[in-house]
Amino acid sequence: MPLSKFGKRHKKTFGKKKEKWDGNFRIPPKPNSYYVQEKGICRWCGKKIIENKVHNKRKTWHQDCATDYMIIYHSGEARKHIWKRDKGKCNECGERCTRRGWDLDHVKPLMEQKGIKGNKLDWSYYELHNMQTLCRPCHKKKTKQDMKNNA
C-alpha cells in the first residue's frame, strides 16, 4: 500500500519528531548516542563491561543497565516488574487487582520533576522502589491528592 504524502500513516512514519521531554515530564531524556566508539563499553553508563575479570568486547550493555533502560523507557517492562513484585495486590487497600484493572503509580509523583532537565534530574523517580501497584479507585484518589499537594 503506497504512502500518500497527506495521509496519517505518512505523517506518523516520516513526520517531524518532536522532543517529548519539553512538555512531557514522564519520559526522561535519552542518552546522546546509542553507539559507542569501542565495543565492550556500556551504552548507558559508559563503563567497561567486565565479565569473569575479562573485558568483554562483544557486549554493549551491562545487564543491570539494560534492565534500568527498559524500565525507564518501556512502561510495559516496568508494569511487568511491579506486578510480579507486588503480586497483583493494591498497596493502598490490599485488594487483589485484575490483570487490566490496576495502575502503576509513582510513590513520589513525577509531576515534581516537571521542567527539571540535565544533571539536576533525579533518576530515583524512575526506579522500581518509587513504583507501586494501585487499583484504579485508589490511584484516582492518590492522583487527586498529589495534584492538590503540588498545586
Question: What are these model-derived regions, one by one?
Answer:
Residues R26-Y34, N56-E92, K120-Y125, H129:
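Short, charged surface segments at domain edges that flank catalytic/cofactor-binding sites
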Residues G40-I49, S75-K108, C135-P137:
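Short cysteine-rich loop/turn motifs with clustered Cys
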Residues P2-R26, S33-M70:
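BZIP DNA-binding basic region
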Residues F14, L110, T143:
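Alpha-helical and His/Cys-centered functional microenvironments
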Residues E95-T133:
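Histidine-centered nuclease catalytic patch
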Residues K53, G101-L104, D146-N149:
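Generic domain-boundary/flexible-linker signal
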Residues Q37, W83, M147:
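A short, flexible N-terminal coil/short beta segment enriched in small residues
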